[in-house]
A protein has these predicted regions:
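Bacterial N-terminal signal peptides
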Residues: 7-15
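Canonical positions in the second alpha-helix
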Residues: 31, 66-67, 102-103, 138-139, ...
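Hydrophobic face of amphipathic alpha-helices that form TPR/SEL1-like repeat modules
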Residues: 42-49, 53, 77-85, 89, ...
Length: 176
């Protein structure tokens, strides 16, 4: 009898939790469908990560794009990542670069770092060490350790700038 009682209580709590979750998702979808950029971004994240919904990269791309087209810096970055890695979309380095650039211009540290990489290695864009240096500096000055390390390499190798061992050491120490 005692087991039956606790099983009944568990079922009630579980069904309330499912009901609340479904209600939450329904509200987010409603806001996203009405054009609210933050709701679109959050719904996309849920689909991308399989949080409270089944993971679905196609739906994630759809909602990231809706939000990104409204200027959401985080959605622009995530859309760039999807094209960079081929998550739910074909790998397209030029499309990834486009979205990273939009996000970087708005101050995304990760997007700035990715632009530094793209320009350094000529991925999705023509190789340009000067622009690589610019974007690494932007990201490194905000504390991105990968950008700091790569900035060190540009100074050490004398790419886009004069060879400067003291600057190389400075950024090497920051990037460790």
């Amino acid at each position: 009898m005692f087991k039956l009682f606790f099983s009944f209580i568990f079922l009630i709590i579980f069904s309330l939790t499912l009901s609340a979750k479904e209600s939450f998702i329904s509200r987010i979808e409603g806001l996203a469908n009405r054009g609210f950029s933050d709701a679109q971004y959050n719904l996309a994240r849920m689909y991308a990560n399989g949080e409270s919904v089944e993971q679905n990269f196609i739906s994630a791309e759809y909602w990231f794009r809706k939000s990104a087209e409204q200027g959401n810096v985080d959605a622009q970055y995530q859309l760039g990542r999807m094209y960079d890695a081929g998550l739910g979309v074909p790998i397209d380095k030029k499309e990834a670069f486009k979205w990273y650039a939009l996000s970087a211009e708005q101050g995304s540290i990760e997007a700035q770092y990715n632009l530094g990489l793209a320009y350094r290695f000529g991925v999705g864009v023509e190789q340009n060490f000067t622009k690589s240096l610019k974007w690494y500096k932007e990201s490194a000055s905000k504390g991105h350790s990968g950008a700091q390390y790569n900035l060190n390499l540009l100074f050490e190798e004398g790419l886009a700038t004069r060879k400067d061992i003291s600057d190389a050491i400075k950024w090497y120490r920051c990037g460790r």
